[in-house]
């Protein structure tokens, strides 16, 4: 059986060890960069669908848009890093939760047609978020 052996350059191995030591600093920054791209797409789509196609004039208070945000990067129970784009709770005053209102807008209800904004924003932002995360990772690796 043929056998090949490769030796990695010493400077490359040093850079990998420095990268390993700073992973917990770098990963949240990279995910935050991607999360901001997704957040802007969701915010744009939400603005486009609120008040559109209604029978009566819109009574929107922009409270749903104001509650939209990005969570800090955290390790989940599987050991993977997550960042979430979603709505803060609770809503000011009385009424339904932000998640319920977003769900009604996204999927509709009896007498109210669906106006998807999350699914469309997710699909539209995928490439941009990947590019932003790659750029941020390259920037952080370049600092090593």
Where are these regions (language model features)?
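Short, Lys/Arg-rich flexible segments
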Residues: 1-84, 89-93, 98-144
């Amino acid at each position: 059986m043929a056998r090949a052996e490769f030796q990695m350059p010493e400077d490359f191995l040093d850079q990998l060890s420095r990268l390993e030591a700073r992973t917990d600093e770098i990963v949240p920054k990279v995910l935050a960069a991607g999360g901001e791209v997704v957040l802007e797409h969701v915010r744009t789509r939400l603005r486009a669908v609120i008040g559109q196609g209604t029978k009566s004039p819109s009574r929107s208070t922009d409270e749903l848009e104001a509650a939209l945000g990005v969570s800090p990067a955290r390790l989940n129970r599987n050991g993977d890093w997550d960042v979430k784009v979603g709505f803060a709770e609770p809503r000011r005053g009385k009424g339904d939760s932000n998640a319920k209102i977003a769900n009604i807008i996204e999927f509709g209800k009896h007498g109210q047609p669906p106006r998807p904004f999350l699914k469309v924003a997710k699909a539209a932002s995928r490439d941009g978020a990947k590019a932003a995360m790659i750029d941020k990772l390259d920037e952080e690796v370049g600092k090593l």
